[in-house]
């Protein structure tokens, strides 16, 4: 995810406010305090929703684990790192990640895999389902501190991935057809939407302007075998759609 060329337009500042606010239904009411809501949400989650799944003495460690997961949204899952940060063993970290998935706090995005291309990662990526909760856990107290922070790109990617999956499901798609691409040479494509034997590559950029170089990595799909490469997209902060190449279009975040 690129983080260059961030635009200062009012639309894009509103976008960062939306990302920071999160998607919880109660927060659609602007009079509801963001900080108070998420403080109460986390407390209720730990005291009620999780208590039946972990022992009470582990609540503090589980909170640290929750924060560690937020700090890794948009990244490959590494159970050892999560376990270290929470002060638990790897087996516990794996179990707790399952708890977060089952309760809808995080999702794991599976990598694209093809028998024709063995050198692809099998490790999923971790995404929070609500960017507001991730911002709260990480102490990003305002949209501006988020936008200027070190994790802006990862949180932006988390938001876009969530919106793409929601839009795809609303259109009758199957979330199991949404992947990412990463191979042994660490070449990556943020999203792959698979429709039968056709792969649609999607890149996510925080910038408002993208060039052909931003999608040069899409060419790795030509080596996958048994698949065709369909129309691609770069989801970014442009105001209007425009062609990047003959087969790739820049798409505004607001339109997904």
Task: Name each model feature, range by range.
Residues 182, 205, 235-236:
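Short beta-strand/turn micro-motifs composed of small residues
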Residues 1, 237-256:
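Domain-level recognition of nuclease-like catalytic cores that cleave nucleotide substrates
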Residues 197, 224-226, 238, 248:
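Structural signature of nuclease core domains in nucleic-acid processing machines
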Residues 28-199:
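Accessory nucleic acid-recognition modules appended to NTPase machines
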């Amino acid at each position: 995810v690129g983080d260059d060329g961030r635009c200062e337009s009012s639309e894009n500042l509103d976008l960062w406010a939306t990302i920071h606010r999160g998607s919880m239904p109660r927060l659609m009411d602007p009079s509801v305090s963001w900080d108070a809501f998420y403080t109460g949400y986390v407390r209720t989650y730990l005291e009620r929703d999780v208590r039946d799944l972990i022992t009470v003495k582990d609540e503090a460690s589980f909170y640290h684990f929750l924060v560690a997961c937020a700090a890794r949204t948009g990244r490959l899952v590494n159970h050892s790192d999560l376990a270290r940060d929470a002060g638990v063993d790897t087996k516990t970290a794996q179990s707790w990640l399952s708890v977060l998935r089952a309760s809808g706090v995080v999702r794991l995005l599976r990598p694209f895999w093809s028998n024709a291309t063995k050198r692809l990662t099998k490790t999923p990526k971790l995404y929070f389902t609500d960017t507001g909760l991730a911002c709260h856990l990480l102490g990003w107290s305002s949209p501006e501190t988020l936008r200027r922070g070190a994790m802006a790109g990862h949180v932006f990617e988390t938001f876009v991935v969530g919106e793409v999956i929601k839009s795809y499901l609303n259109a009758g798609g199957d979330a199991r057809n949404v992947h990412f691409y990463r191979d042994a040479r660490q070449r990556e494509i943020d999203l792959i939407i698979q429709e039968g034997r056709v792969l649609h590559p999607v890149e996510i950029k925080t910038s408002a302007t993208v060039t052909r170089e931003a999608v040069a990595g899409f060419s790795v799909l030509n080596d996958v075998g048994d698949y065709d490469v369909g129309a691609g997209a770069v989801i970014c902060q442009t105001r209007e759609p425009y062609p990047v190449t003959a087969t790739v279009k820049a798409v505004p975040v607001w339109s997904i």
